[in-house]
Every structure is written in C-alpha cells, then in structure tokens.
Amino acid sequence: MKHIVQQIHFIGIGGTGMSGIAEVLLNLGYQVSGSDLVEGAATKRLKELGAVIHIGHDPKNVGTAEAVVISTAVAGNNPEVLAARAAKIPVIQRAVMLGELMRLKQGIAIAGTHGKTTTTSLVASVLAEGDLDPTFVIGGKLNSAGANARLGRGDFIVVEADESDASFLQLFPAMEVVTNIDADHMDTYQHDMARLKQAFVQFIQRMPFYGVAVLCIDDANVRDIIPFVSQPILRYGLSEDADIRASNVRADGTRMHFTVERRTVRRHGNKPGPLNVTLNLPGLHNVRNALAAIGIATELGVGDQAIIKALSEFSGVGRRFQRYGDIPLASGGKFTLIDDYGHHPVEMAATLAAARGAYPDRRLVLAFQPHRFTRTRDCFGEFVQVLKNFDALVLTEVYPAGEAKIPGADGKSLMKAALVDDKTSKALLNSAAVAFASSVAEMPEKLGQVLKDGDVLITMGAGSISALPHTLSEAKHV
C-alpha cells in the first residue's frame, strides 16, 4: 500500500478505533492527518507523533490526501467526505484500513459482543511477555503501554473485530477469538438473531486453513454456531467439554485464582500440563477472557511462565473496572471509585458480580448513563433487573449518540421501573438511596446526597459519563 498511497486523512480521528490505526500508520512512516469536533487526549497524542490535526470539519482539511478513512459514525454528508468524493479520493471504512494493516502481519482478531477490549489487551500482553513483540490496535488504553495502539517488531498484529456494523467481515485474520454472541446493535442484522449468528460463522470461515478459532463454549450462542464451522477450533470456558478449561476458581479481592487444564493443543508437540494462574482482574467474565488469551498463547508456543507472569502482572485497560482509589466525602469518611465502560445489561451484570466478589461486605452504588435510546428500549427489562441489584442508584438521561428520543426508553422511565418490586409493587430502595441527575454535570451533587462512608461507587456508561471519574477524583471531596 505504501508504494501507492502515502498521505491518509481520518475523519473522526479522535475515536478510539480510528486513533489506534492512525498511530500505527504514523509509526510505519505514513503521512497522517485527521479532523475531529473536539480536541482530546487521542488527538493530542497523535499531534505529538507527527499527525496534522484539525478541530472541526472543513473541506480544506482533506488537503492532498490520497485516501480518506471514516467510521460508521461519520455521516455521508460530512463536508470532508463530500470534498473527498468530489476530488475522486477513495473514502474507505475504518475496518478496510484495519484489514490492510493486517495484511502486513499475521492477524489475530478478537470478536464478540462483550469483552473484546479486555481480551485483546490480555492477548497482546501475554504475547509481549512471550517475546513475540506484537503490534496491537485496541478499543481502550492498555495501561502498561499508555496507549491503545503500538507497532511491534514481531510477526503478529492483535486487533478488535467489530460486529456492531458487521465490519469484522472486512478482516482476514489467521487466528480468531469469539468471546460471546449477544443481542446488541441488532439494527445491523434486521433484528434477527439468526443473521447475527450467521455473520459470526462467516467471520470464522474467513480464516485460512492453517488458522484456529478460539471460541467460548460457555456462551450458548457460540455453542450453537460450532456445528456450522469447518475451520479448526479450540473451545474455552468453565464447561466440562472445554479444551482450555478453568477450575478451582476463587476470588481474592480484585484478583482471581484458578487452575487451567489444556486438553487439546494442535501445534507444539506434547499436551501441556496444568497452569495455576493468578489473574490481576476480578470476575468470572475476566477468567474467561484470560482463558482465550491462554489458548492463543499456547497455540503460538508461549512458555507457561510467560503466560503466568503476564496475567498476574496485568495492569488493566482504561475504563474496564478501572480503579481510582479512595475519594473523601464532604460528610466525612471516604468511598472507593471504580469506572467501567459497560453499557449493556450483560456487561453491567458481569461488573456487578465482579464488584460483589471483590468487595463482599460493602455497599455498591451505581452512577449510570444509559447509551442510545434504541438499546434502552430493546433491553429495558434487562436493564431494570440489573439496576435493582445495586444498593443505591444515581441515574441520568440517556446519551443519544445521534438517535432521536423514544418515549418510555429514557432515564426517568428506567429509574421508575427499577425502584418497584415486580411482585408487590412496593418501593425497593428508600428515597435516600436513589437520585436522578438531569445531566452528568449534576451527578457529583446527587452522589454527595447518596454516598456513605465505605461505599464502592461504580460509574458506568459509554457516553459523556466517561469524564465523571476524573471530575470526582480531582475534587477535594464529594
């Protein structure tokens, strides 16, 4: 590609997926420019690395670019898109450019409705500890690298494969992971679960004959598609029929201990022995994510001690059960602050379970901003059930992400439904344990009314609530 195209322009370059690809291209020697509506940490970093960054969208920003990269969030009437097309400059989707990067190395693609970012980070960390020096492009900041992307000198590139817009079907990886398949972004699949499952089958079948798909057998929908897969597979999970299986699982604060049995390995001689693993992440869902990384690493011949060391020293990913420490309360005492990207009921339930295991004797308070009216509508009942399992709640209005408001699928409706017992119609929590904030900016004030000494506060959501943890941690008290 470099002999033909040297100047590449990104519209929406500050997005997590876009900025990672841009950074790798910069490190490969391409000339990169990009635009976004606001300046953020990602745009500042790219500017320091040599990218030309424009704040705001303007046809002039395209300049002399030879290709323009967009995400599905960029509208077709964006002035830079229109300018590029008028000038006959190719306008390509982010996934197409990611696919081009994967041509340069052996691709390892991590797919699934939930857990992609953490699993991608675990795979990259284990391969790095095994001296394979991978390139990676991740949907969150890998804390040990201080970035969401890195150009390695090794033969492998580890990336997230996005099913939300079916763009993972643009990729041709040599190895794959599927963490789970769940009903989300169903507009892409005409609200048909069979279409979603078929897309994952197609994704797996894109591997070459020498590839391997590492699949979570604990997930019912993943299990359902296995009979339709002809490519080599490894099954992982806690189930008895898993090839990479965890047993003797126990929580120890924010760490998990477990034993791994590896029953099937195709590439490296004798069957490996069991591993006694300490994972520096909480929750059963993260045990499964670690098993996926162990499956990939074992296939590639990474030594046992490197696997054990990488998992025990894993420093986490930004906004995935990210711990901010203890924050003072104005009323006296302190609370523990944790931030998480979870915005689907399944993700929220997994984070809640992890927090219960890590802090069994403490009150769990949720500050939540729902994300998208369509998701709130489609998963309304599931959201309500998860919200009922927290000890206290502060909710705010839905982050629209460009969607129009849907009656009955708003934050206040969620709050009202979550506070009533289905059987008795009585209130579940007293008024001192709940609050509704009209905006994220109002949440600190409402939290000050709800929080008590010793509480664990979990901020959750994929929208503007991402700024709340920094606000709380920088304040003298709440």
From Swiss-Prot:
Residues that hold ATP according to the record: 112-118
Molecular function GO terms recorded: ATP binding; UDP-N-acetylmuramate-L-alanine ligase activity
Alphabetized InterPro entries for the sequence: Mur-like_cat_sf, Mur_ligase_C, Mur_ligase_C_dom_sf, Mur_ligase_cen, Mur_ligase_N, MurCDEF_pg_biosynth, UDP-N-AcMur_Ala_ligase_MurC
Signal sequence region: none
First-level EC class: ligase
Keyword Cell wall biogenesis/degradation among UniProt keywords: yes
Pathway(s) the chain acts in: Cell wall biogenesis; peptidoglycan biosynthesis
Catalytic reaction annotation: UDP-N-acetyl-alpha-D-muramate + L-alanine + ATP = UDP-N-acetyl-alpha-D-muramoyl-L-alanine + ADP + phosphate + H(+)
EC number annotated for this UniProt entry: 6.3.2.8
Keywords from the UniProt entry: ATP-binding, Cell cycle, Cell division, Cell shape, Cell wall biogenesis/degradation, Cytoplasm, Ligase, Nucleotide-binding, Peptidoglycan synthesis
A Pfam family hit: Mur_ligase_M
Location in the cell: Cytoplasm
Any GO BP annotation: regulation of cell shape
Cellular component terms per the entry's GO annotation: cytoplasm
Alphabetical list of NCBIfam families matching this protein: murC (TIGR01082)
UniProt similarity note: Belongs to the MurCDEF family.
Purpose of the protein: Cell wall formation.
Protein name: UDP-N-acetylmuramate--L-alanine ligase
Organism this protein belongs to: Polynucleobacter asymbioticus (strain DSM 18221 / CIP 109841 / QLW-P1DMWA-1) (Polynucleobacter necessarius subsp. asymbioticus)
High-level lineage: Bacteria, Pseudomonadati, Pseudomonadota, Betaproteobacteria, Burkholderiales
Recorded name of the encoding gene: murC
